[in-house]
Regions:
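Conserved AMP-binding/adenylate-forming core of the ANL superfamily
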Residues: 16, 36-88, 105-110, 171, ...
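Gly/Ser/Thr-rich phosphate-binding loop
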Residues: 243, 263-271, 280-337
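Conserved AMP-binding/adenylation subdomain of ANL enzymes
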Residues: 201-218, 228-268, 278, 282
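ATP-dependent adenylate-forming carboxylate-activation enzymes
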Residues: 77-78, 98-114, 125-135, 243-264
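Conserved AMP-binding A3 loop
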Residues: 45-49, 178-202
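A short helix-loop-beta submotif of the ANL/AMP-binding
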Residues: 59-60, 71-72, 78-98, 102-106, ...
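ANL superfamily adenylate-forming
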Residues: 2, 127-174, 283, 337
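Conserved pre-ATP/AMP-binding loop-to-beta segment of ANL
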Residues: 17-18, 32-35, 164-182, 189, ...
Length: 337
């Protein structure tokens, strides 16, 4: 009876016993000069060798702040190159990165600051959506926090941290917590889900395997990096394969997403159903050259069959029979091994 209910398909690849930092070293040694990240809206690019060096600089900078193995470090930002640097740098330092939703208001931020016990928070002063500095001041008022450092990316503190002397931890274990993500809180208070290095590395391995990613691929990631879709599916599949991460904009923009596919000759694109609908609704949709695409992912919300088939035909054209646009289901709480 059990055999009829439980089964697996596909190759039985062994789980990787690597930390995020160890995987970064492996990928950088294989493809040092290949593109790792392209942040289109910032006009910034990094190779895998450059990203590895940047991660080490972040880790040493965290050490100089007094951040040690197992400490929590918050990141409150929309999509940017600095987000990827912090993701890799915290992992290298053995610190747990706490993803903070950029849409948080002061009471939500205060809850996260308190519950996570983060010792440092990295953020921008403000953007078109919000003044984060003001929200932070309101959030911390009257609270007893462990927060000792606030580092603004758009201040001299950030480059100074990257140049700070420090050291890397002697050992980071695969079962150490790499990432804490807070749930949406629709049925109660948000819960901090703790994801280990072992979890996210192997999630990335099987995603890269399923998409047949190689160092030749470029993955457009318009979904938010603070979410599991962005920081696990978006970054770790690239880290496992040597593919490049392409960030089209700070937040989702349909035109910027298609422009990134067009300009970078991307081979894969991610999104939730509503993002694809917005892209197809652009008046100039037909002006974008999407012929480089061979695969992609739709996740994050229910998807009617009609929308999925439309995505296949419009993004992949006549190639849809040979290509794969994957529907992916999952929740943060069970996104772990």
């Amino acid at each position: 009876m059990l055999s009829t209910l439980s089964h697996t398909r596909g190759p039985n690849r062994p789980l990787l016993e690597l930390t995020i930092g160890g995987l970064l070293d492996r990928t950088a040694s294989l493809y040092p000069d290949r593109l790792a990240v392209a942040s289109c809206h910032q006009s910034k690019r990094m190779t895998w060798a450059e990203l590895t060096a940047a991660a080490d600089s972040v880790a040493r900078g965290l050490w100089s702040l007094g951040i040690r193995h197992g400490d929590r470090v918050g990141l409150w930002s929309t999509n940017c190159l600095e987000w990827i640097m912090m993701h890799m740098g915290c992992a290298r330092a053995g610190a747990a990165l706490v993803n903070v939703n950029p849409a948080y208001r002061s009471h939500e931020l205060g809850y996260t600051l308190t519950r996570s016990r983060m010792k440092a928070l990295f953020l921008w002063h403000k953007d078109k959506r919000a003044n984060y500095e003001e929200i932070l001041e309101r959030a911390r008022h009257g609270l007893s926090l462990e927060l000792k450092h606030t580092i603004y990316f758009d201040s001299p503190e950030w480059p100074a941290l990257l140049d700070a002397p420090g050291q890397l931890p002697a050992h980071v274990a695969v079962d150490d917590v790499a990432n804490i993500q807070y749930t949406s809180g629709t049925t109660g208070h948000p819960k901090g889900v703790m994801l280990t290095h072992h979890n996210v590395v192997n999630n990335g391995q099987f995603l890269a395997q399923g998409f047949h990613y190689t160092e030749q691929d470029l993955i457009v990631v318009p979904v938010p990096l603070f979410h599991c879709y962005g920081c696990v599916i978006g970054t770790m599949s690239a880290l496992n394969s040597g593919a490049a991460i392409v960030l089209p904009n700070w937040t989702f923009d349909a035109h910027a997403t298609l422009q990134a596919v067009h300009d970078e000759r991307a081979t894969s694109v991610y999104g939730v159903p509503a993002m694809y609908v917005a892209e197809f609704g652009l008046p100039d949709f037909a002006s974008f050259d999407l012929t480089s695409l061979r695969t992609g992912m739709m996740s994050g919300a229910p998807c009617p069959v009609e929308d999925w088939l439309r995505t296949h035909s419009l993004l992949l054209g006549e190639r849809w029979k040979e290509a794969a646009h994957i529907l992916y289901f999952g929740v943060r709480e069970v996104a772990r091994f």
